[in-house]
Swiss-Prot record:
UniProt organism field: Pseudomonas putida (strain GB-1)
Keywords: Cytoplasm, GTP-binding, Hydrolase, Magnesium, Metal-binding, Nucleotide-binding, Potassium, tRNA processing
Residues the entry annotates as binding (6S)-5-formyl-5,6,7,8-tetrahydrofolate: R24, E81, K120, K456
Protein name per Swiss-Prot or TrEMBL: tRNA modification GTPase MnmE
Residues where GTP binds: 226-231, 245-251, 270-273, 335-338
Database matches in PROSITE patterns: G_TRME
Keyword Transport included in the entry's annotation: no
Subunit structure, interactors included: Homodimer. Heterotetramer of two MnmE and two MnmG subunits.
Alphabetical list of PANTHER family matching this protein: TRNA MODIFICATION GTPASE GTPBP3 (PTHR42714), TRNA MODIFICATION GTPASE GTPBP3, MITOCHONDRIAL (PTHR42714:SF2)
Amino acid sequence: MNTVRETIAAIATAQGRGGVGIVRLSGPLAGKAGQLITGRTLTPRHAHYGPFRDDDGLVLDEGIALFFPGPNSFTGEDVLELQGHGGPVVLDMLLQRCVQVGCRLARPGEFSERAFLNDKLDLAQAEAIADLIEASSSQAARNALRSLQGEFSKRVHSLTEALIALRIYVEAAIDFPEEEIDFLADGHVLSMLDAVRGELSTVQREAGQGALLRDGMTVVIAGRPNAGKSSLLNQLAGREAAIVTDIAGTTRDILREHIHIDGMPLHVVDTAGLRDTDDHVEKIGVERALKAIGEADRVLLVVDSTAPEASDPFALWPEFLDQRPDPAKVTLIRNKADLSGEHVGLEQCDDGHVTITLSAKGDDTGLQLLRDHLKACMGYEQTAESGFSARRRHLDALRQASEHLEHGRAQLTLAGAGELLAEDLRQAQHALGEITGAFSSDDLLGRIFSSFCIGK
């Protein structure tokens, strides 16, 4: 049997007790199930209050029944919602009644999956439903809602249309060689290609911010021993998460804390002090610290502002740049301002580098500057009209599309190879199609929708 034609049922409200609980059905039997359970023919899109009965006519509960005939429903199929009281026993009895009249229990995310398969929404919009439910901040919720409304998808479709137009031009020139179009001399191809690359770069940047808001930013605290890294972690965490002593090298391993700043998720990693050492255990800690630096979204390079090397803290940077090629993702923290007498504040250079001077021992002003800086790095300052949610798989697809465009441009400019450019354009279009589901394997769809709540 084609499972899409089966009628599915699930409890759509969260587990536990509440004033209202909802059982949702989708499929060809939804209308008949509503008639059998309520004892009446349901008028589409009208609220019907009355009893919900079992097969013997006994009342299971009282509530509201809503019937939405397809295709004008969330899933594109006939949909029935039974809104009763929110007790788990009552809802389970009602769900079993739905099974009794011919429904089967829905898989996690199957309602959203059917909406996708029936072209009611694309894959990015379907994922935004889960992101909206799981949002840990108002900004993340707004971004998810904009993705659900199609903002991210519109940007991807715009890129796809531009690629299609470019492919038509290139492939027409290849198929009709008598036109003798010189791609390089024409200049039109390069102009169109560079325009797509520029827009793709913008979407990549905005999607990266959206992914940080959704998944949280990994912040690694690094620096020399005894620079105050663990004290800074404790202040950010709001508790004594790390042992703090005056003995250099107290922290010898990775210490992770998951915190929220105004609802924004951050994964803060305290690391062993970076120095040459003969201590085998400490050496392992330093190696792990360098590995964590390479995987970080943001590195806080902490220096002791009273130490001699504080006058030239960037002497530490070669060690960091081996792991973190982008120095723009490193924030310099000049710690112990209470001892050095330096002014607490934030300084941003013309090249974008940020230095924050603070004291990790109770300096509220400096710590608030750091919190605000981290929020800005995550895109918290974006307005509700500019952001959208994104996932790591979206970033991978955008990266692949960008790489294909870069490769195709190189093939065109270095070898004048229009055929190779055409293939790279096709591959880039395919990568973008994976975001919206235009090109997606059944395995990918299964993994995505299985992570949803049952009833969604």
